[in-house]
Swiss-Prot record:
Name of encoding gene: dapA
Protein name listed in UniProt: 4-hydroxy-tetrahydrodipicolinate synthase
GO biological process: diaminopimelate biosynthetic process; lysine biosynthetic process via diaminopimelate
Organism: Yersinia pseudotuberculosis serotype I (strain IP32953)
EC number: 4.3.3.7
Keyword Cytoplasm found: yes
Length: 293
């Protein structure tokens, strides 16, 4: 369940900024039909930053309910306060989520020892499998391979989502981690195929929100070692990988999902604003290049 194409699911909202349950069901059904390996609910792409804790939990619980056991659900549970991250994580004990994705603390920029103690405390507070999440471009905090290796020794820390886009990190982590069952996942669609060729086991993907079948196929080709065919598919998807970040994520991907009829609105809460007209043209062209329009 922690390998292959895992979607970092967008959170559909109505015109008032409340969760659009009908669109959420439509998105989940789309991923079930497409063969997506799992859903990450309320991560960065799911707008965790603009949901309060009760709303955060509610979205995950609605996702679980609508998934109905058809697809595994991973809860995003990151915070820049350890006690807050523990509290949020514990709210998902015995709910049916298969694990938690926990981002490094953002803004306060802890030292490597602080990162170790943070994730260790979270893992020791629950039996749920934990996926570390390193995305320094957003958090201002880079969890280095030696710290990841230390954390990999903790029983229920089972994987890392590495979103630096730095492919040398794959081999650096592999050299340092003793546990061959520890899973490396790419958090960067544009370099995901190369990441898997170096030993990664999948992608936690933004692109999968709108190209679910294609990302499932890409990850399957990588798992089979068919990188020649995978590269051909990835070249077709590359404009999407890149231009879904033409403005801050998830602004472009929510617009694209609405454009493709996957959900009713591309509403976001402030400070996120609608996709600009010049960016719409760029994303539209990427959708056409990928064969989605």
């Amino acid at each position: 369940m922690f390998t292959g194409s895992i979607v970092a699911l967008i959170t559909p909202m109505d015109d008032n900024g409340d969760v659009d349950r009908a669109s959420l069901k439509s998105l989940i059904d789309y991923h079930v039909a497409s063969g997506t390996a799992a859903i990450v609910s309320v991560g960065t792409t799911g707008e965790s930053a603009t949901l309060n804790h009760d709303e955060h939990v509610d979205v995950v619980m609605q996702t679980l309910e609508l998934a109905g056991g058809r697809i595994p659900v991973i809860a995003g549970t990151g915070a820049n306060s350890t006690s807050e991250a523990i509290s949020l994580t514990q709210r998902f004990n015995d709910t049916g989520v298969v694990g938690c994705l926990t981002v490094t603390p953002y803004y306060n920029r802890p030292m490597q020892e602080g990162l170790y103690q943070h994730f260790k405390a979270i893992a020791e507070s629950t039996d749920l499998p934990q996926i570390l999440y390193n995305v320094p471009s957003r958090t201002g905090c880079d969890m280095l391979p030696p710290t990841i290796a230390r954390l990999a020794k903790i029983k229920n820390i089972v994987a890392v989502k590495e979103a630096t886009g730095n492919l040398s990190r794959v081999s650096q982590i592999q050299v340092l981690v003793d546990d061959e069952d520890f899973i490396l996942l790419s958090g960067d669609d544009a370099s995901g195929l190369d990441f898997m060729q170096l030993g990664g086991k999948g992608v936690i993907s933004v692109t999968a929100n709108i190209a679910a079948r294609e990302m499932v196929e890409l990850c399957a080709l990588a798992a089979q070692g068919n990188f020649a065919e995978g590269r051909r598919l990835n070249q077709r998807l590359m404009p999407l990988h890149q231009h879904l970040f033409v403005e801050a994520n998830p602004i472009p991907v929510k617009w694209a999902a609405k454009r493709l009829g996957l959900m009713a609105n591309d509403t976001m809460r402030l400070p996120m604003t609608p996709l600009t007209d010049p960016a719409k043209r760029i994303v539209e062209d990427a959708l056409k290049s990928a064969g989605l329009l």
